[in-house]
Amino acid sequence: MAENQYYGTGRRKSSAARVFIKPGSGNIVINKRALEEYFGRPTSCMVVKQPLELVDMVEKLDLYITVKGGGISGQAGAIRHGITRALMEYDESLRPALRAAGYVTRDARCVERKKVGLRKARRRPQFSKR
């Protein structure tokens, strides 16, 4: 690829995204597919574009993304985190705006483990008085 590209890794739940940014016309390619083709629902596309819209670079950068693991929501969050990190590598002056929007912090929430004696993480077995 080009020599003036910037990289960022993003993670969310069990998903991990590798994001490569280079100056271009606004193409977003995820796992060799277009953004709208990869994510069927508009909310996921919106989540992916949030950091770019915040710093007003939707039409100025091309993104090449590979993402693995998890589901649609987790992958979208991982991509957003990766784009944010790549943008900060591209221009460090964008960090305060991205930090204020809450995109820099990795969302550490993940599935709570199932406990012994319970049906799920917190769901108890049905209680019978008699």
From Swiss-Prot:
InterPro entries: Ribosomal_Su5_D2-typ_SF, Ribosomal_uS9, Ribosomal_uS9_bac/plastid, Ribosomal_uS9_CS, Ribsml_uS5_D2-typ_fold_subgr. One of its GO terms (cellular component) is cytosolic small ribosomal subunit. It comes from the Bacteria. The keyword Cell membrane does not apply. Belongs to the universal ribosomal protein uS9 family. PANTHER family: RIBOSOMAL PROTEIN S9 (PTHR21569), SMALL RIBOSOMAL SUBUNIT PROTEIN US9M (PTHR21569:SF1). This is Small ribosomal subunit protein uS9. It comes from Vibrio vulnificus (strain YJ016).
